[in-house]
Amino acid sequence: MDTMKGTTTVGLICDDAVILATDKRASMGNLIADKEAKKLYKIDDYIAMTIAGSVGDAQAIVRALIAEARLYKMRTGKNISPRACATLLSNILHSSRMFPFLTQIIIGGYDLTDGPKLFSLDPLGGMNEEKTFTSTGSGSPIAYGVLEAEYDRDMSIEEGLKLALKALKSAMERDTYSGNGVSVAVITKEGVKLLSDEEITKLLGNDKSKTKKKSTRRRKKSK
């Protein structure tokens, strides 16, 4: 039986913040199984994560991480750090390497002493700290093309949001397993903020208006 899978997720570091973005389509073979799939989760006050791959495996990981983050806070009175959270997940995945979780994970967070942090993890527990950006899922090759061409480490949060959405939009236009809207989170020293549909629509609307203006200018020049 086919499992629900297929997605595009993006994570990037910008001016003192981490931005995570995902699409909302879950596919089962060639069938679109869910048009409102949740792939972006808040783990703690300063940590969020994205999932790609087998939905059941990914959701089990999300539940485990949320529980561990709460236990850590109960025992220590502090929030777990993004690095500790990523390392914990790496250990969980590696311990199950003979029967791996079929998923790719991005963990983004804000360390109050060390700034924004971004990590990517593979199904066997391999963990990479990303200094710029990362992407996972079936649409990631397309998203990477946009990120490689336009990313700037010093970009503002608004610019970072627009780039993440542009990378997702490009992937959704070419990858049949990605689509049906987006979810976005911004993580700063103030904590995790999940953007509303209205805020996302506004950002996408601004990009569309700029694109129309550019195309109009090109037409005028060609005339």
UniProtKB/Swiss-Prot annotation:
The 20S proteasome core is composed of 14 alpha and 14 beta subunits that assemble into four stacked heptameric rings, resulting in a barrel-shaped structure. The two inner rings, each composed of seven catalytic beta subunits, are sandwiched by two outer rings, each composed of seven alpha subunits. The catalytic chamber with the active sites is on the inside of the barrel. Has a gated structure, the ends of the cylinder being occluded by the N-termini of the alpha-subunits. Is capped at one or both ends by the proteasome regulatory ATPase, PAN. InterPro entries: Ntn_hydrolases_N (IPR029055), Pept_T1A_Psome_bsu_arc (IPR019983), Pept_T1A_subB (IPR000243), Proteasome_bsu_CS (IPR016050), Proteasome_sua/b (IPR001353), Proteasome_suB-type (IPR023333). Component of the proteasome core, a large protease complex with broad specificity involved in protein degradation. Its EC number is 3.4.25.1. It comes from Methanocaldococcus vulcanius (strain ATCC 700851 / DSM 12094 / M7). It is found in: Cytoplasm. GO terms for molecular function: threonine-type endopeptidase activity. One of its GO terms (biological process) is proteasomal protein catabolic process. CDD domains: proteasome_beta_archeal. It catalyses: Cleavage of peptide bonds with very broad specificity. It is an enzyme of class 3 (hydrolase). The active site is at 7 (nucleophile). Keywords: Autocatalytic cleavage, Cytoplasm, Hydrolase, Protease, Proteasome, Threonine protease, Zymogen. The formation of the proteasomal ATPase PAN-20S proteasome complex, via the docking of the C-termini of PAN into the intersubunit pockets in the alpha-rings, triggers opening of the gate for substrate entry. Interconversion between the open-gate and close-gate conformations leads to a dynamic regulation of the 20S proteasome proteolysis activity. It comes from the Archaea. Gene3D superfamilies: Glutamine Phosphoribosylpyrophosphate, subunit 1, domain 1 (3.60.20.10). Pfam families: Proteasome. This is Proteasome subunit beta. GO terms for cellular component: cytoplasm; proteasome core complex, beta-subunit complex. Residues 1-6 form a propeptide. Its main location: cytoplasm. Transmembrane segments: none annotated. The gene is psmB.
